[in-house]
C-alpha cells in the first residue's frame, strides 16, 4: 500500500545515516474496487426485479446510499441508488429510469422493512429516498453514531481509515450525477460507498456500546425516521453562491 505523504518526504528531511522509527505509524490499505466486481447499472424492470430477488435471498442489514447532484441541480433528487446486503449482492440502481413511486421501489421498500437499513449521514439521503418511495423503518446512521461516540472525524473516508485501516478515494463526491451515461470510475466510487458500510456499522455499534451510549444513539436514529419531512425550499436559486454579485437582468436569467 502507498506510504503516507510525510513518510515519502522523510529522505529529504533527515541525514542519510539517521534512523527513522516508523513502526507505529498508521498505514491504510486503499479500497479500489468492490470485492465482487463492479455491477452493471440497473435501468430495466427485469434487472430491478432480479436485484430485489437477490437482496431477499441475503441476510442481515442493508447498506444504502444515494448520489445527488446538489452542486448542479436545484432539486435534491437521487440520480443513483447503491444498495448491498450480505449474500444479496451489491446493486446500482438508476432511479431516473423508473421515476418516483414506481411499483418496484415499493417492492424494494417492503423488503427493507424486514431489517435495519444503514446510511451514512442519513438526513442528507432520506429526503430523496422517500421521494422515490423508500422509507426505512429501522435505521443505523454511521455518521451520527460516530459523532455520538465522540470520534473527532466522522466522514465516511476518515471513519473507514481510523476504524478499519482502509482508505477511500473521494474525488468524485461533487460530480454531476445527473450525467448520462455515468462513467465507470464514478460508478466504482459509488459502489465503494456501501462496500464496507455493514462492517463499519458494526465497529461504530461496538464503540457506542463500550461508551454506554448505544441506547442514546438508537433513540436518535428513531427520531430521525419519525421527524416530519422538511418543507420544500421556495426559490432555491436564491441560495446560489455569489447571487449578490448578479446585477444585470440577462445574468439573472442564467441563474
Specify the residue positions occupied by each region the protein language model found.
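Short acidic catalytic loops
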Residues: 62-67, 141, 193
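N-terminal accessory regions of nucleic-acid-interacting proteins
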Residues: 6-62, 66
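A broadly used, surface-exposed interaction patch
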Residues: 82, 86-107
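Short, small-residue-biased leader/transition segments that mark boundaries at the very start
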Residues: 1-3
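Acidic, Mg2+-coordinating catalytic module of metal-dependent nucleases/exonucleases
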Residues: 168-229
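C-terminal accessory/connector segments of nucleic-acid motor ATPases
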Residues: 211-255
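Short active-site oxyanion
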Residues: 90, 111-117
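Metal-dependent phosphoesterase core characteristic of DEDDh/y 3'-5' exonuclease domains
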Residues: 82-84, 88, 123-179, 187
Amino acid at each position: 500500500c502507498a506510504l503516507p505523504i510525510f513518510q515519502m518526504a522523510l529522505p529529504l528531511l533527515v541525514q542519510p545515516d539517521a534512523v527513522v522509527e516508523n513502526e507505529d505509524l498508521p498505514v491504510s490499505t486503499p479500497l479500489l474496487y468492490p470485492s465482487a466486481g463492479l455491477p452493471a447499472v440497473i435501468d430495466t424492470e427485469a434487472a430491478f426485479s432480479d436485484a430485489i430477488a437477490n437482496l431477499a435471498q441475503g441476510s442481515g442489514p442493508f447498506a444504502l446510499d444515494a448520489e445527488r447532484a446538489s452542486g448542479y441541480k436545484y432539486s435534491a433528487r437521487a440520480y443513483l441508488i447503491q444498495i448491498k446486503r450480505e449474500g444479496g449482492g451489491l446493486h446500482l440502481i438508476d432511479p431516473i429510469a423508473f421515476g418516483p413511486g414506481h411499483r418496484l421501489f415499493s417492492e424494494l421498500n417492503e423488503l427493507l422493512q424486514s431489517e435495519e437499513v444503514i446510511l451514512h449521514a442519513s438526513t442528507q439521503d432520506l429526503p430523496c429516498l422517500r421521494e422515490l418511495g423508500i422509507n426505512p423503518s429501522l435505521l443505523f446512521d454511521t455518521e451520527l453514531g460516530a459523532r455520538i461516540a465522540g470520534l473527532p472525524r466522522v466522514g465516511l473516508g476518515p471513519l473507514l481509515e481510523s476504524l478499519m485501516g482502509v482508505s477511500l478515494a473521494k474525488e468524485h463526491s461533487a460530480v454531476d450525477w445527473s450525467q448520462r451515461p455515468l462513467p465507470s470510475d464514478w460508478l466504482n466510487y459509488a459502489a465503494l460507498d456501501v462496500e464496507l458500510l455493514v462492517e463499519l456499522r458494526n465497529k461504530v455499534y461496538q464503540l457506542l456500546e463500550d461508551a454506554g451510549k448505544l441506547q442514546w444513539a438508537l433513540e436518535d436514529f428513531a427520531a430521525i425516521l419519525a421527524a416530519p419531512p422538511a418543507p420544500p425550499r421556495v426559490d432555491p436559486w436564491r441560495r446560489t453562491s455569489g447571487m449578490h454579485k448578479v446585477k444585470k437582468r440577462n445574468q439573472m436569467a442564467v441563474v
